Amino acid sequence: MLDSKLRFFLQRCVVLEQAKQVHAQLVVNRYNHLEPILVHQTLHFTKEFSRNIVTYVKRILKGFNGHDSFSWGCLVRFLSQHRKFKETVDVYIDMHNSGIPPSSHAVTSVLRACGKMENMVDGKPIHAQALKNGLCGCVYVQTGLVGLYSRLGYIELAKKAFDDIAEKNTVSWNSLLHGYLESGELDEARRVFDKIPEKDAVSWNLIISSYAKKGDMGNACSLFSAMPLKSPASWNILIGGYVNCREMKLARTYFDAMPQKNGVSWITMISGYTKLGDVQSAEELFRLMSKKDKLVYDAMIACYTQNGKPKDALKLFAQMLERNSYIQPDEITLSSVVSANSQLGNTSFGTWVESYITEHGIKIDDLLSTSLIDLYMKGGDFAKAFKMFSNLNKKDTVSYSAMIMGCGINGMATEANSLFTAMIEKKIPPNVVTFTGLLSAYSHSGLVQEGYKCFNSMKDHNLEPSADHYGIMVDMLGRAGRLEEAYELIKSMPMQPNAGVWGALLLASGLHNNVEFGEIACSHCVKLETDPTGYLSHLAMIYSSVGRWDDARTVRDSIKEKKLCKTLGCSWVEGSYH
């Protein structure tokens, strides 16, 4: 009678405290044979991961007199389901070391964990244990082997495990399909896909996504059209493919046709417009959204920040805080907002962010730290920037580049060079931004030879100098009075020189009152810019500086005749070269 009552209560244990109360009755009345049911019920009804429950179950398992594979398997599966992959493997090893034979659930779960860990674990020993315990006839174990070997890149072993499955299900087929796709064998993956007897959404999405990532939107679109039931994820994959190919018109066509848009759909489109610099279209979509969540605000703020509209980014951030008390910015939001303030040179905002983080318990990650470093360096608060940089958990290309760029803007060549040397010693690969900062530092410090060495070393790091890098070199040579050398460098450029490059030569011509190169540079700027007022004004000043008053007057008259609005500033004066 008591046995039946305890079984009744065991079936209804849904929280830890209830489980403990029933467990106490089991121990007192020596009904230990019911403990496996307790373990199962406790883990089964726990929807969210709980460290207390795991500790409690482990204590029960350690106290078992008999070898209960079922209960150990429940714990292994629970940990795997909650993405505690390392602990899943550790518990499985404990079970094995205790001499307890694994259940099919335990093997399936640990195989999944092995493939999901950051440093994937070779599953061959587990495969051997499954064979020894006669579990390789289980379709779930066999499918788990296919999945693990696929992720490890052992595609032949995955294929063999797949062939051994007597009754293949859709999950088995998808595991093999995923394996070929992960190995980059798209043609073989397509053959597998075509053989799948009952394709599900995962099958379709895997193959469509692979074609989209490759940029083969013809095949991706054809498969999408053939897909019988399209999920929101399927639509997003196709839209994302067109976005990555910069085909925003086609992306917008499918977006507009999508029956049920979700947050990912809107964010994908806004991000696509962001990359193309089409802020107006991004704004239009943003306004169309009836209910905006934090991620959508993040996308739009990032759009403004990345496209040189920092004031709009800050205005939207303020609106987000005012209108949506339920939305709290996190490190991603704040990183974009800090970058916007960095463009405005407002270092005081960094102090506000640090206070906000402390007040709201937000974790300051390396992304946000790097944005703050960039803000402080550009604002001249070097002590704060260097302190924050030294406290980073992991220094990477982006954080080093932010520091070096800050040094470059402020002419700190020694510091920039030291950072670059440390970066190379730690085998952290530099990028084009790194060299922009380093070259700027050498340019501001007049270190021409070092600048040349740096410029020529870009190819050693598999980087091709861009027009911006050539522009900085022209600026550096121009500052040093080596105008002819700067002109020859421009003529040697593998790409078409832009107005920024010619503008650097024009400015240098003004510094040294050189009419010849000033005229050459200005003529190119006039051809390249729709409003060349600033360039013409500067040429007029060069004429005036050498006493050629008539020529200066002629240039100024031409500005008036063309009804150009005279503005003394122009892009190359406000850009990164100065």
Swiss-Prot record:
Alphabetized Pfam families for the sequence: E_motif, PPR, PPR_2
Top-rank lineage group of the source organism: Eukaryota
Signal peptide annotation: none
Entries under InterPro entries matching the protein: E_motif (IPR046848), Pentatricopeptide_rpt (IPR002885), PPR_At4g14850-like_plant (IPR046960), TPR-like_helical_dom_sf (IPR011990)
Region (Type E motif): 501-576
Protein name (Swiss-Prot/TrEMBL): Pentatricopeptide repeat-containing protein At4g22760
GO molecular function, one term: RNA binding
Keywords noted in UniProt: Repeat
PPR repeats: 68-102, 103-137, 138-168, 169-203, 204-230, 231-261, 262-292, 293-327, 330-364, 365-395, 396-430, 431-465, 466-496
Transmembrane segments: none
Keyword Signal in annotation: no
Keyword flag Repeat: yes
UniProt lineage: Eukaryota, Viridiplantae, Streptophyta, Embryophyta, Tracheophyta
Family: Belongs to the PPR family. PCMP-E subfamily.
Protein source organism: Arabidopsis thaliana
A GO biological process held by the record: RNA modification
